Structure formats: structure tokens, C-alpha cells
């Protein structure tokens, strides 16, 4: 779309305006400049009927060869050839500013001194400008371009990479910004170049950015191009262009768009403040045993990366059977990139940094999507994104589940799917969507499944309301999704095969009949609500503190209802409302119990509960879909209120928003001092008790209820293997997924002793069973650390082994090599 008509700037009456100015930047071009000037003057002289009066301005950038003399000699023969000079070499950008500022043309052609694009190509550019464009730029990458002589392959590769970065960071949609052959409307060119600040090669990008911001139409025109020897582009110039791109990108950002991510980071750090500043010695109490588990995941991934081991499997816990890491949420998409930090600072630091940054990045991604797709008002988008990322369910999972907190890819996937509906660049968008989906699978499969459910709910409702949109978008959408699947499949095929068929894979994980949300949970407040939290009530309405998947509070529900009623005429509002309501109902599970009654109704989740993939989902988590939907509804309301001129309406409306959101503001997550790791592990004493192929057996075995032994293992730099643990693995012939290792008689008995303090009668049968279990575990030594009922535990182990343990560096040890 062409920009609005602009009045021409005031022109000095003494200055003669010409039809075309040709600006040639030059630095030490003594050898190439003469033929270039001859070719241009000859062509323009032969085509004055088409191009009218013309001038050539050579902008010398402090050359120290005979460049100026070449221009001076041509000026004597043809006064239309002029020279402007810079006292010293400052770069192409400086030269172009000088040359364009000195121009008088209604149109300005900028061409490189090597004339790699022949002057005859001017006719193509002139035709585009004649159709109302503000600029026509020659392109080597546009369809129809001809490359008659290629650059060196390395230089060509660097150029393509540079153009890709430029498209992503500065001027999306333009394939080639660096072809030195561009025709501009004269007045607009002088304005854009005068506003430029870059002295280097990045000025082309800066000027095109100026045209974009001014909404001036730019056409990319395929041209003939031939590489010329003697290029002034040096290897370091590519690095300088990257620096200039970074400057342009930073300059194009609004201050608020820089401030908002910083605010999100501060909010995230505040939430994690109890652990963030000393992660090695602090523990998130409400994470139960998940912090131990996730630190182990990060540690074992880093170890696999460092030693080039299989990233999908480990036998460090669950020994000897091991753990299918791909079937557990190890988040290879982050635990692998964070491996250097894990190896350097330890898994506690790495996990803490990852979760704080990931939560902030997720909020920033929702902010970006809301600004791009929902509202333009930044404050409204900030409020909506804050709710989407810091809603009570997200805060609950922030205790323990980084895969449900670090969701920055979800807004990007949503945006890319919406681009497919537009149908403009289906192949490109399909490829990118496939890559994004593949990466999200390595961040978390269940969040991707839930996000897909939310997108389907939204698309279905929006499609019913906008049949024309469906008719226009279904073909490119299906084509793009097909391309995405073709791109994604080869990347994830082997990992998913390993997950579902590989060692220690399982069919599904059963969560019981109480995993759905009560309707009361949707209206109540979460435990960590700073102003309205009620620990007893929240725990009574949820599985545990890490699974408070609803708890939006009745004020927000009431506000959302009011927003939907007030803005009902908008299809977007209706679709968001349907998405939130449908997700809330699905989250109640296959059976919905009406509060305060014994009445139970079948829920729609029953249709999905036993389907593949869905059977392993904790259905209460479906309510997390409500968070971004509610965030967008609130953002729409805040934008509407900010724009109204009725102060009473604005005041009452914004007050209602504040009253609905303030009860949801979370208190920092609870953190406590971490129990010290016994010196037996940290000092390496354990090494003298465990031989190659053997395991060290902490008793009772680590399990989902007590996984401190995983912390001991990471503190010992994964120096020993152990049975038991906290992971998802198979059980029985049906390979049903369970939490922890398959139970054995000895481990079950010792666990009962630990929790009840009741010691069973231990005779020859128990001793024989223990001997078989120790052999199965390849046990080299048994360890009992100080813990509740440890005296009863020691007695039980002594009777099983037939000898007392030894107190060694903070633990009791039974060396099974000593004839037991």
C-alpha cells in the first residue's frame, strides 16, 4: 500500500531540479569507476527521452588513490558528472548520505561503483516507480533474477545468511537488501538518508526500515547481476553488519517493549526469590519431590551430553532396568542447551535459572502475541500476558513442573498457525510450524497437546461465527499443516519410537478418579494467592500443591462474564469465551459432581479419557487453557476502557479489573533450607563400597514420596547407580505406567517400616527374599541415612543382612562384599 501523498519540501529556487540523480558511492575505485561512469553517461545520454534531465554524483569516501582524479576528468568532459568528498574514510553509509544529500533529482538511483547490476536494468526499476511505488530495489533473490557470474561459494553463503537475518530482524519480506541497485522517489530518499545514522554497509537496511515505518511502498525487482572482482567487502564487514543490525533492531524497539520483558523477569525472580539467590541450599517446599527429580533430569542430560551417551536412556536410577528419559519429561529442548551451565554450576543452579528465565520468556511471548493479534495498547497487553503466564495454575506448576511453566513456544506456534490461515507464504510458514512443533515436543508433549486442544476449540467456535473465513483459509491451513507434519515427523520419529517402544517404555499413566477439577475449584483462590489464599481449602480441592489447576477466583469469572456480555458483538470475544468455558468443563473430568450435593453428571472428558495420549493426561490441567483465553479477554476490556472518554465508565471498569486480578497476585513460592548431603556422598567415600557393575542402595529405596537420594546422587556427580527412584516406568505384563520403579518385597517392607515405625517379624523367608532383591539390584552396599524411624530401619536391615551397619561419614553402611 502506498503511503499518503506528501507535499514536496521547500526547494531553493536557485537549485535546478533534474529528473534523475545517480549516486555512486566510491572508495579507492580508481580502476573500476571510469568504465562505470562511461557506461552510465552513455546509457542515459541515449535515453534522455525516457529518463529526462539527469546528473551523476560520485560520493568519494576519503579515497587515497586516484578516484577523485577519475571523476574530475569526467566532469571536464560532462558537467553533469559531479564529485562530493569526505575528508576521511567513514564507510558506505557516510558516502551515500553525502551523495543523496547533494542530489537534485525527482528520482534517485543508488548504484555500486562496480555496476554489478548493469545500468540497463534501470528500466525495470523505473517501471515500478511509474506505478506509484516509493522505491524499487534490485534483487538477486526475487523470482526471475539472473546471476551471470557467481561470488565465491563462501561469500555467497554468508550473503544468504545475512539476508536471512535481515529479513527476520529488520525488514521482513524483502529477500535481498544488499544488491547495490536501488531507485527511490527523490524527496523520500533524501528524507530517509538524512535520518540514517549508520556509516557502514547496514545503511541499506536502515533506509528500507525508514520506508517501512513511513508506510511507503517498496517493490523488489529481479535484475541481472554479475559478480565483479575487486570487492571492498571484507570478512570482518559481515560481523560489522551484524552489529549494525543489532543497533537497528534495538533502535526500532519501543521503550515499553524493552521494559515489559524486564518487568516479567522481575516478576519471575520475585516468585522464585526463596530459591533463586541460593539454589544449592534452598528447596521449594511445595514441589514435594519434584525439585530433586528435575535437578536429576538436568544433571543426567548434561552427563549424557558430556560423554556422548544415549540422551533417551539412563540406568543411574531404576537400576538395573533403567529409565526411559524420552518417556519422562526431561525437556531435552532446554536441558541440552543448559548442559554447559549444569556442568559448570550444578543442576540446582541450572534448573533455577532455567525456570526463572523460562517463565519470564513465556510471559513475554504471550505479550508479543496479544500485541500482534488482539490489542495494540501495550498496557492492556501487559495485563493480559501477566494473567496468561502468572495465573494461579501456572504458579502452582511453577513449584515443580518447568514443562508447564516454560511455554514460550506456544504463542509462537499459535501465531504461525494463524499465518497459515492467511495463505500468503504457506510453504515457509508450514516449514517453520513443523520446526516449532518438533522443538516443543522436546520441551513438553502434554502442554503441546493441551495447546492444540485450545486451538481446536477456538478455531471451531470462530469458524462457526465466520464461515467466510473458513472458506478462505481451510485450504492453505490444511496444506500448511501437512507441510508442518512432513517437516516435524523426521525430527521426532526416532525419539517418539524410543518413547513408546524403547526400553522401559509404558502404555499409559493412571491418575485415579479424582484428577478432575471441582466446579468450586474454578471459583476459589489458590494457596499462594497473596491476598486471598487458603491452604486448607485449596488442598481439599486439588490433588496436591503442584496440581492446583483452576483457582481463577469468582471475581475474575464474574469480570470475564461482564466482558463477554459487553463485547458480545465481537466474534473474537465469543470464540475466546467458548474456549475458556469448554476447557473449564472438560477439566472437570469424566464425572462432574455438583457441589454440595450427591448429584453426578457425565462430563465430556469421558469421550476422550480412554483415547490414546489423552488417557495419560491429568484432566484437571485442561483448565490451564483458560489462562491465555481469560488474559486476552481482559486485555480487550482494558484497551476498550483506556480508549473511552467517559471517565466514570473508565474508572469503574478499571477498578473492576483491579479487584478481579489483585486476589490472584501470587506470594513468593515457599522455600526452606535444604537438608545437607551426607559427607559419605560428597567426599566420595561411597566409591570404596561400590565396584563396577554394582549399585549403591539407599534404604528405603527412593520413590515419588521420598527422592532425596536423587539429590545425593547429583551431589556425587552421578558417581553411582541406584535402584528405585522417581520417574515414570512400566509395571507388569501390561506395561502400565507407574511412578517409580516396579516394587519388590524388600523395598515395600522397608518403606512401611520407615513410615509406620512398625517392625515385622523377619525370619528366613524375609532374609531369602532380601538376598534375591539385593542380587537383582546388583547391590554393593546398603545405606541408611538419618530419617524418621531410622532406628527401626537399621534393626530391619541388620536382621535381613545378618550383621550391624557401620556409621561412616553421616550414614549407616552395610558392605555386602564382607561375606554377608
Question: Which stretches of residues belong to each language-model region?
Answer:
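Membrane-embedded helix bundles of polyisoprenyl
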Residues: 264-267, 355-373, 378-465, 480-495, ...
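Extracytoplasmic
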Residues: 511, 658-820
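Membrane-interface coil-to-helix junctions
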Residues: 267-362, 391-407, 516-540, 594-606, ...
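Acceptor/aglycone-binding surface of glycosyltransferases and processive sugar-polymer synthases
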Residues: 86-102, 107-110, 119-201, 227-236
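Membrane-interface helix-loop-helix junctions at transmembrane boundaries of multi-pass membrane enzymes
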Residues: 467-479, 560-602, 644-650
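Hydrophobic helical membrane-anchoring modules
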Residues: 1-17, 171, 195-256
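Periplasmic/ER-lumenal interhelical loops and adjacent helix-loop junctions
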Residues: 288-304, 477-480, 484-564, 606, ...
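A conserved acidic beta->alpha catalytic loop
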Residues: 60-69, 115
Amino acid at each position: 500500500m502506498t503511503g499518503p501523498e506528501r507535499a514536496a519540501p521547500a526547494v531553493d529556487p536557485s537549485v535546478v531540479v533534474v529528473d534523475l540523480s545517480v549516486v555512486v558511492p566510491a572508495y579507492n575505485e580508481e580502476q573500476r569507476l571510469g568504465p562505470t561512469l562511461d557506461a552510465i553517461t552513455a546509457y542515459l545520454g541515449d535515453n534522455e527521452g525516457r529518463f529526462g534531465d539527469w546528473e551523476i554524483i560520485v560520493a568519494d569516501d576519503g579515497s587515497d588513490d586516484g578516484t577523485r582524479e577519475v571523476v574530475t576528468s569526467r566532469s571536464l568532459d560532462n558537467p553533469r558528472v559531479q564529485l562530493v568528498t569526505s575528508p576521511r574514510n567513514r564507510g558506505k553509509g557516510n558516502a551515500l548520505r553525502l551523495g543523496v544529500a547533494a542530489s537534485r533529482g525527482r528520482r534517485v538511483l543508488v548504484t555500486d561503483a562496480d555496476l554489478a547490476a548493469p545500468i540497463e536494468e534501470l528500466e525495470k526499476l523505473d517501471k515500478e516507480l511509474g506505478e506509484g511505488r516509493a522505491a524499487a530495489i534490485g534483487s538477486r533473490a526475487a523470482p526471475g533474477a539472473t546471476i551471470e557470474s557467481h561470488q565465491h561459494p563462501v561469500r555467497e553463503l554468508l550473503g544468504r545468511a545475512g539476508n536471512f537475518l535481515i529479513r527476520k530482524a529488520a525488514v521482513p519480506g524483502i529477500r535481498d537488501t544488499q544488491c547495490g541497485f536501488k531507485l527511490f522517489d527523490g524527496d523520500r530518499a533524501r528524507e530517509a538518508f538524512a535520518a540514517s545514522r549508520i556509516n557502514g554497509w547496514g545503511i541499506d537496511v536502515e533506509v528500507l526500515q525508514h520506508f517501512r515505518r513511513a508506510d511507503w511502498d517498496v517493490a523488489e525487482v529481479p535484475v541481472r547481476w554479475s559478480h565483479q572482482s575487486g570487492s571492498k567487502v571484507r570478512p570482518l564487514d559481515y560481523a560489522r553488519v551484524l552489529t549494525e543490525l543489532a543497533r537497528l533492531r534495538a533502535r526500532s524497539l519501543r521503550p515499553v517493549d524493552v521494559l515489559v520483558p524486564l518487568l516479567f523477569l522481575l516478576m519471575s525472580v520475585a516468585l522464585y526469590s526463596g530459591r533463586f539467590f541460593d539454589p544449592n541450599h534452598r528447596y521449594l517446599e511445595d514441589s514435594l519431590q519434584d525439585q530433586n527429580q528435575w535437578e536429576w533430569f538436568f544433571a543426567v542430560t548434561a552427563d549424557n551430553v558430556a560423554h556422548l551417551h544415549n540422551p533417551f536412556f539412563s540406568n543411574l536410577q531404576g537400576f538395573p532396568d533403567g529409565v526411559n528419559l524420552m518417556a519422562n519429561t526431561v525437556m531435552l529442548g532446554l536441558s541440552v542447551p543448559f548442559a554447559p551451565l549444569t556442568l559448570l554450576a550444578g543442576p540446582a543452579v541450572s534448573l533455577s535459572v532455567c525456570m526463572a528465565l523460562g517463565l519470564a520468556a513465556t510471559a513475554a511471548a504471550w505479550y508479543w502475541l496479544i500485541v500482534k493479534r488482539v490489542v495494540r495498547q501495550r498496557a492492556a497487553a501487559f495485563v493480559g500476558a501477566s494473567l496468561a503466564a502468572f495465573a494461579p495454575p501456572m504458579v502452582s506448576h511453577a513449584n515443580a513442573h518447568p514443562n508447564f511453566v516454560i511455554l514460550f513456544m506456544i504463542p509462537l506456534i499459535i501465531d504461525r498457525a494463524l499465518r497459515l490461515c492467511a495463505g500468503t507464504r504457506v510453504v515457509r510458514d508450514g516449514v517453520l510450524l513443523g520446526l516449532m512443533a518438533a522443538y516443543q515436543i522436546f520441551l513438553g508433549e502434554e502442554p503441546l497437546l493441551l495447546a492444540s486442544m485450545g486451538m481446536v476449540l477456538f478455531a471451531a467456535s470462530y469458524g462457526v461465527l465466520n464461515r467466510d473465513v473458513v472458506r478462505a483459509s481451510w485450504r492453505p491451513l490444511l496444506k500448511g499443516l501437512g507441510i508442518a507434519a512432513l517437516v516435524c515427523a523426521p525430527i521426532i520419529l526416532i525419539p517418539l519410537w524410543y518413547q513408546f517402544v524403547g526400553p522401559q517404555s509404558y502404555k499409559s499413566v493412571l491418575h485415579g478418579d479424582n484428577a478432575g477439577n471441582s466446579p468450586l475449584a474454578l471459583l476459589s483462590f489458590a494457596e499462594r494467592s497473596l491476598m486471598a489464599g487458603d491452604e486448607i481449602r485449596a488442598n481439599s480441592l486439588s490433588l496436591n500443591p503442584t496440581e492446583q489447576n483452576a483457582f481463577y477466583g469468582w471475581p475474575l469469572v464474574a469480570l470475564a462474564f461482564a466482558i463477554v456480555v459487553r463485547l458480545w458483538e465481537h466474534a473474537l470475544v465469543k470464540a475466546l469465551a467458548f474456549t475458556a468455558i469448554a476447557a473449564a468443563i472438560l477439566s472437570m473430568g469424566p464425572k462432574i459432581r455438583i457441589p454440595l450435593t450427591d448429584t453426578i453428571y457425565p462430563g465430556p472428558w469421558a469421550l476422550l479419557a480412554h483415547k490414546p495420549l489423552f488417557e495419560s493426561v491429568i484432566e484437571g490441567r485442561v483448565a490451564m487453557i483458560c489462562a491465555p483465553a481469560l488474559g486476552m479477554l481482559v486485555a480487550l476490556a482494558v484497551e476498550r476502557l483506556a480508549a473511552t472518554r467517559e471517565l466514570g465508565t473508565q474508572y469503574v471498569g478499571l477498578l473492576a479489573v483491579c479487584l478481579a486480578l489483585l486476589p490472584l497476585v501470587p506470594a513468593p513460592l515457599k522455600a526452606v533450607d535444604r537438608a545437607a548431603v551426607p559427607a559419605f556422598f560428597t567426599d566420595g567415600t561411597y566409591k570404596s563400597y561400590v565396584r563396577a557393575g554394582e549399585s549403591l542402595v539407599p534404604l528405603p529405596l527412593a520413590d515419588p514420596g521420598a527422592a532425596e537420594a536423587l539429590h545425593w546422587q547429583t551431589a556425587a556427580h552421578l558417581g553411582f547407580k541406584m535402584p528405585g527412584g522417581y520417574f515414570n516406568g512400566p509395571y507388569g505384563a501390561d506395561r502400565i505406567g507407574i511412578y517409580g520403579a516396579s516394587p519388590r518385597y524388600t523395598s515395600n517392607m522397608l518403606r512401611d517400616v520407615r513410615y509406620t515405625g512398625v517392625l515385622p517379624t523377619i525370619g528366613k523367608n524375609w532374609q531369602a527374599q532380601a538376598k534375591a532383591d539385593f542380587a537383582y539390584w546388583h547391590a554393593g552396599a546398603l545405606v541408611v541415612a538419618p530419617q524418621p524411624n531410622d532406628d527401626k530401619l537399621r534393626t530391619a536391615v541388620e536382621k535381613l543382612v545378618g550383621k550391624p551397619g557401620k556409621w561412616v561419614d553421616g550414614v549407616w553402611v552395610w558392605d555386602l562384599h564382607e561375606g554377608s
